[in-house]
Amino acid sequence: MKRFRLVSLALAAAAVLAPGFAHADVVAPQLQAPCGADLADAMTLLSDERTYVTCQEGAAGYAWAAAPVPFEPNDTWLSYGPVITLHGQGMRNPNLTSGRWTATPRDSETVCRVQQETVVEAGVLSTPQLSEGEPGQPLEVAMAPKLFYVELAGNCLWERD
């Protein structure tokens, strides 16, 4: 019985400590939190799924600032782990425009992924189209015309070419 407890404690400790050794967790953007100069003018959707923010330079450096809604479609987006769902030109007030995009992973383990749904006809959406890169490698993707929903995932910087 004593051996069972020791093994159980060892396994529990390993489970708790293991994530710390794998790689650092991605820090989710927060309103007024610092962001790097490499993200200047990038937008993202906060985890509340309602607040859009843009990385802007201020007196104290770069920070995430609330974006006025509605806003013009942006050509640079940051996905930071959880899926962010945006709207394309198949909907009023699109968040991004169709065309060629490149997703660049922000670390060597990240896989950039995008799922798109387009408008087929009034009230009808296409089957979701999935594109996924390789770990640490850029993903080039064509955002479809009449794009309705687009889900961006991974710790990636998405830029319109």
What are these regions (language model features)?
Residues 77-96:
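Surface-exposed ligand/attachment interfaces on beta-rich extracellular proteins
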